[in-house]
């Protein structure tokens, strides 16, 4: 079965997941909706400062995108209800504008003819969140779902492994996060987040994040046990989670590493990675794993208290799991 998808919003995540979708034989992108001119959409897809040039032939013909001879419909429509997904027999819409984050607004895609909707970020209401490595097995056919955030996708698989083996009592997370498109290049007005308005190239910026709390939604056993903060740093891509955690079952740091390594090779293969190399952030650029445990970067204070470090490409890794969720919802 070929899954026909439409992408609403062709920003960083929209473009990265489009690239990844080209490598999946069972997924076909048949439509893109964005307010940009089609020629500019083609340009932004072709050239990427972080991930390099797009490897396939791109052209624009009659306001449609042509990739290796295959036509992709381009529209510039603000109201999702007018997108006419039914005319293209769309199975799943990927909602990546960051604007339609409630059931009522996302449901407009259903009214337009889409069968399912996957939101690329945490919702603003009770839209269920599904994270690979945490709760994909709980999906029951819901029409509108969220893939949570990139940080939740990093933290949840690691937290599940630790909780399953050692029993998490409580934990604090810090994500050291690469800059994103919502930040300001130089100091600019930001009424809701004063610090967030400061220049992204000049500063390490403390920020709030709901990623750790969201883990409790996809892993109910951890509800109320985790919270966290973020620091935005002047890098283009790749972020890292620092999970400082207290657990019930005594274990040395080496024993924890062994458990994570085994999980990365078995149950969590393709989701959770493991490395003992002397790595830095750019070494993870382009990695589709959503959480890569860095054994040499962490440590423990005693047998019940440890600091665990896990890297993630906040664009590629996350986009890869969005497509995994698309496959899940399309087949149920």
From Swiss-Prot:
The active site is at residue 150. SMART domains: Gp_dh_N. It catalyses: D-glyceraldehyde 3-phosphate + phosphate + NAD(+) = (2R)-3-phospho-glyceroyl phosphate + NADH + H(+). NAD(+) binds at residues 12-13, 34, 78, 120, 314. Its main location: cytoplasm. D-glyceraldehyde 3-phosphate binds at residues 149-151, 180, 209-210, 232. Catalyzes the oxidative phosphorylation of glyceraldehyde 3-phosphate (G3P) to 1,3-bisphosphoglycerate (BPG) using the cofactor NAD. The first reaction step involves the formation of a hemiacetal intermediate between G3P and a cysteine residue, and this hemiacetal intermediate is then oxidized to a thioester, with concomitant reduction of NAD to NADH. The reduced NADH is then exchanged with the second NAD, and the thioester is attacked by a nucleophilic inorganic phosphate to produce BPG. Belongs to the glyceraldehyde-3-phosphate dehydrogenase family. This is Glyceraldehyde-3-phosphate dehydrogenase. It comes from Buchnera aphidicola subsp. Schizaphis graminum (strain Sg).
């Amino acid at each position: 079965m070929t899954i026909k998808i439409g992408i609403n919003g062709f920003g960083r995540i929209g473009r990265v997941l489009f690239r990844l979708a080209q490598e999946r034989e069972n997924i076909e992108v048949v439509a893109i909706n964005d307010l940009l001119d089609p020629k500019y959409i083609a340009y932004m897809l072709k050239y990427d400062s972080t991930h390099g040039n797009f490897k396939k032939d791109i052209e624009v013909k009659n306001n449609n995108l042509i990739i290796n001879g295959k036509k992709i419909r381009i529209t510039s429509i603000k109201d999702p209800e007018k997108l006419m997904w039914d005319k293209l027999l769309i199975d799943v819409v990927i909602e990546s504008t960051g604007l339609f984050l409630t059931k009522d607004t996302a449901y407009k895609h259903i009214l337009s003819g889409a069968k399912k909707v996957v939101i690329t970020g945490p919702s603003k209401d009770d839209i269920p969140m599904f994270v690979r490595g945490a709760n994909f097995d709980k999906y029951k056919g819901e029409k509108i779902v969220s893939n949570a955030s990139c940080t939740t996708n990093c933290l949840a698989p690691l937290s599940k492994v630790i909780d399953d083996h050692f029993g998490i009592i409580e934990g604090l997370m810090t994500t050291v996060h690469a800059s994103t498109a919502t930040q300001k290049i130089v100091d600019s007005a930001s009424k809701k987040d004063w610090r967030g308005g400061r220049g992204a190239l000049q500063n390490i910026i403390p920020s709030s994040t709901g990623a750790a709390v969201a883990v409790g939604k996809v892993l109910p056993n951890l509800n109320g046990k985790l919270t966290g903060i973020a620091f935005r740093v002047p890098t283009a891509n790749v972020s890292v989670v620092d999970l400082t955690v207290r657990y019930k079952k005594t274990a040395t740091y080496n024993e924890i590493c062994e458990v994570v390594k085994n999980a990365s090779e078995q149950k969590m293969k393709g989701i959770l990675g493991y490395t003992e190399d002397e790595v830095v952030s750019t070494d993870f650029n382009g990695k589709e794993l959503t959480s890569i445990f860095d054994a040499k970067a962490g440590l423990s204070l005693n047998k019940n208290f440890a600091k665990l470090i896990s890297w993630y490409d906040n664009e590629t890794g996350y986009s890869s799991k969005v497509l995994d969720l698309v496959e899940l919802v399309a087949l149920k």
